[in-house]
């Protein structure tokens, strides 16, 4: 016991050192600002404001939480400030869905609405022709301007959106997931049986927040799962999701046959008590669907799906996640944990896309959605996977129909199988397309997909690829908060305001680094050319000259 206590103190010391030295998130030419609520005046919604050299500014959705506020001291092991605790204490113990159905707007709903607008309601564009031309095609989505707390309440009540916010995760900053809102991106972290520690996972969490992760899933499968999860939750301002099956399996030393409903139930309660915001539950993998996957090229590629299929065959019984689904609903309702219904039969190769097994499970997901809603539990549906571009639209169409417009949460999809080491690119192509079609949450893919556990650089590259995909979809949908950043960056580029161009980029450091590889001096930041075209062939420079000539003529 003494040795175990000493080790725990040592880990706490290491975490304190890390948080003291490395847990500050900074962005160039940016400051933390706060927007006040109107329905709930005590609400202060943190955002990022970029200051431009011409006097303009841009307000951005910010996932960095208190880590980017120099006035907030983050202490370990206590973790982040408990933002939602005062709201939770003074109201009945109900889910956000239950409140929404009763017509009640919660502080979380107003908070999420303020985040979605990013102060865009204060900015008016006077070029009406340009607005009409670039208004976007939202397909069947309805995106109001501005987004109001009442609109968010109604979307939650109808099951078209979720606000994942476990009552035991008061550190989280409320956010909304649904196709009528900004497309969100999830990052996966977590240890394996071979590598990683508590300190490394907290470092990965904060790194993911730095690069824009809207939600984070802890997919730890090795030792110290509970300790890692507790530390992540206490230090996370974004919703945290898990796959409880992984810890349940760890409790029986990886013996699938020894897994029972009782072990899983206790694991579920334990994780809900800690504060996990959403659970991936593979309740749609039914006995009768397992043979459908046998003719596939790559079989069952979902970890949770393959484990439950094996359990069903070993016991010759139906999936206990399905047979005990109402009991799972009761547990999740008690803590306001949201469902992320797992796609255990998702295709793991282009050859298996849109097959009978995949869509059979999707139909069951839709049935389970309706049960979850009956119990007042929020739900979203997980989707593929590996899908060629020409089959992506069918996935979105079927999900909207089978699942009654519940939020769709997809892993990519990867549009080709030939890109190991570059799967973040191949999948971001599919992610942009399906997000435009209506997918609400994109699970990022890193360059290490299919190859190994991602490191910090992999996390960054995966998130950048997926933030591009999400933003491209927001532009295509015509989200009112999407285009201003593009316009400001384009103006800075045309006016040769190099520092502004860098600072408005998703990755300012890389943009500046690439420019400075050939033109490193400060004088080059004021030059009217870059190394690609040089001073004589720069089209922007020539375009300025053309404008000047036309003005003189007219």
From Swiss-Prot:
Binding-site residues, substrate: 188, 217, 246, 282, 302-304, 343-346, 382, 409
Enzyme class: lyase
Keywords: 4Fe-4S, Iron, Iron-sulfur, Lyase, Metal-binding, S-adenosyl-L-methionine, Thiamine biosynthesis, Zinc
Keyword match Mitochondrion: no
Necessary cofactors: [4Fe-4S] cluster
CC cofactor note: Binds 1 [4Fe-4S] cluster per subunit. The cluster is coordinated with 3 cysteines and an exchangeable S-adenosyl-L-methionine.
Pathway(s) it belongs to: Cofactor biosynthesis; thiamine diphosphate biosynthesis
Organism domain of life: Bacteria
Record-linked InterPro entries: ThiC (IPR037509), ThiC-associated_dom (IPR025747), ThiC/Bza_core_dom (IPR038521), ThiC/BzaA/B (IPR002817)
EC number(s) from the headed UniProt entry: 4.1.99.17
Statement: the UniProt record of this protein carries the keyword Metal-binding: yes
GO MF annotation list: 4 iron, 4 sulfur cluster binding; carbon-carbon lyase activity; zinc ion binding
Binding site for Zn(2+): 386, 450
One GO cellular component term noted in the UniProt record for this chain: cytosol
Residues that, per the record, bind [4Fe-4S] cluster: 530, 533, 538
Catalytic activity: 5-amino-1-(5-phospho-beta-D-ribosyl)imidazole + S-adenosyl-L-methionine = 4-amino-2-methyl-5-(phosphooxymethyl)pyrimidine + CO + 5'-deoxyadenosine + formate + L-methionine + 3 H(+)
One GO process term, biological-process aspect: thiamine diphosphate biosynthetic process
HAMAP family according to UniProt: ThiC
Sequence similarity: Belongs to the ThiC family.
Function summary: Catalyzes the synthesis of the hydroxymethylpyrimidine phosphate (HMP-P) moiety of thiamine from aminoimidazole ribotide (AIR) in a radical S-adenosyl-L-methionine (SAM)-dependent reaction.
Record text on subunit structure and interactions: Homodimer.
Name of the protein this chain belongs to: Phosphomethylpyrimidine synthase
Organism expressing this protein natively: Coxiella burnetii (strain CbuG_Q212) (Coxiella burnetii (strain Q212))
